Each structure stands twice: as C-alpha cells, then as structure tokens.
Amino acid sequence: WIMGHMVNSIAQIDEFVNLGANSIETDVSFDKQANPEYTYHGIPCDCGRNCLKWEYFNDFVKGLRRATTPGDSKYREKLVLVVFDLKTGSLYDNQAYDAGTKLAKNLLQHYWNNGNNGGRAYIVLSIPNLNHYKLIAGFKDTLKNEGHEDLLGKVGHDFSGNDDIPDVEEAYKKAGVTGHVWQSDGITNCFPRTLKRVRLAIANRDSGNGIINKVYYWTVDKRSTTRDSLDAGVDGIMTNYPDVIADVLSESAYKNKYKIATYEDNPWETFKA
C-alpha cells in the first residue's frame, strides 16, 4: 500500500492518486463536544509540506465517497484504503467513546450513504493514545445499533503513538479487538528514525500468535529509506511522494517481490509468502 500522507483537501485526493497512491491518510480534528470537525493537520507538520489545507470533515468525506464509489464521475479505482489519523489529543479521555459514536454516525451518513451504494474503501481508524481505546467501542456499538454491523468488515485499527507492542496488545484486549490490526511506526520526515520497532512489529505480525496483521512505516520520502523499509518487509509505506515509492517498487530487486495492492487484496489478512 502506497499511502499518501496528509491528504486533507478534496483536491489532494486526485493529486496523490495521480502520483501513484492507492491509499491516503487524512487528519481528523474534533471540536469540544467530540464531533469530527475538520480534516486538518496544522503547524508544525512534515518538512516541505503546506500544513494548512483543510475541509469540513463532512465535506471531505462526501468527496472521498465520490472518489471510491464505482460509477461516480470522480471515481478512482486505485484508491482502496483510507487511514483516518484521529487527532484525539484535544479530547478528554472520557470523551473517547463519544468521539467513536459521532465518527461512526458521520461516516455512516456521508461516506457509506446509510449502506446504500456508499464508498467502498477500507477504513483504518488510527488513534494516537492507548487510553482512548473506548473510541473503538463507541464506533462499533453505533454501527451495530444503527443496523449496519456489516460495515465493520470494512474497518480496521491502528494505534499510532509508537508505544511498546505489548502495551498496544493490551489496549486491543481492553477494546475487544481481535483482528483488522495495522501497526504504524514512524516519525515526521524532518528526523531520521531506525527500523528497530518496525522489525518488532513485523516479528509480531509473522509470529502467528501476535495481533498485528499489517505494518506500515511513516513518513518515507527517500529512495534509500524506501528500500530499507521494503527489505524489512513492511506492508505499507506512508509518503509525501507516492511517485518515489512507486519508482522503487518497479526496481528489479522489488518488482517480483511486491505488488501494489488492489481492492481484491484483503487489508486485514496477514500476508503469507
């Protein structure tokens, strides 16, 4: 999965897919009542990027729906996965459940079109704080209560705080999550970071008894780091330059080992070579 980083305006969806992304990451900020409000990152953000692009969350999600609904004039077949980077740092811990509820209602209406030919992309809910695990329950309970439990088949999870893997597993246990787990590792492109924790996450993924299904590394903008990540065995790379990742994937060392994921590739299944 080539994951376009910080895609927060509708125009950027096309921009990143045109560069080779089959997945995007979108920042979601919340208001004081735990409603998803804007797709917005703000300052500081990655070096070399405009941090200030934004939409109202509802508007972005409607644009995203069009980009991922077959038959729509804006449909982009290649875009199959969306990571919502949930900026829950502005919320109190006891608002996490509410945030999950409100996010689910919003996506149900504006993305899934109440289950009536909505967007088809797989969605990863990425939470920065392990203490906010109740957001997952709020989200799941709401879809069940609204009669759309089937849509949970399209939803996966990530804790993005670079916590120790056993602590992440513990949070999932509390949240009742047993699958659909992506594990991120990384740092802003302004600083280097070793692949040490990525390798631990990959070991968990491949152990057969860990909780992790997929591992992605962020934010990777250089060819050398891309190669190191692929050599380590990641499933996804988050980047400001999807064309760089696509270029490296076409090199002889990688083109027979990796393929760019399509809608037919299940993002919740651990890949066995």
From Swiss-Prot:
The keyword Phosphoprotein does not apply. It is found in: Secreted. The active site is at H5, H41. It comes from the Eukaryota. GO terms for molecular function: lyase activity; metal ion binding; phosphoric diester hydrolase activity; toxin activity. Disulfide bonds join C45-C51, C47-C190. Binds 1 Mg(2+) ion per subunit. Pfam families: GDPD_2. Keywords: Cytolysis, Dermonecrotic toxin, Disulfide bond, Hemolysis, Lipid degradation, Lipid metabolism, Lyase, Magnesium, Metal-binding, Secreted, Toxin. Mg(2+) binds at E25, D27, D85. Its EC number is 4.6.1.-. Its main location: secreted. Dermonecrotic toxins cleave the phosphodiester linkage between the phosphate and headgroup of certain phospholipids (sphingolipid and lysolipid substrates), forming an alcohol (often choline) and a cyclic phosphate. This toxin acts on sphingomyelin (SM). It may also act on ceramide phosphoethanolamine (CPE), lysophosphatidylcholine (LPC) and lysophosphatidylethanolamine (LPE), but not on lysophosphatidylserine (LPS), and lysophosphatidylglycerol (LPG). It acts by transphosphatidylation, releasing exclusively cyclic phosphate products as second products. This is Dermonecrotic toxin LruSicTox-alphaIC1d. It comes from Loxosceles rufescens.
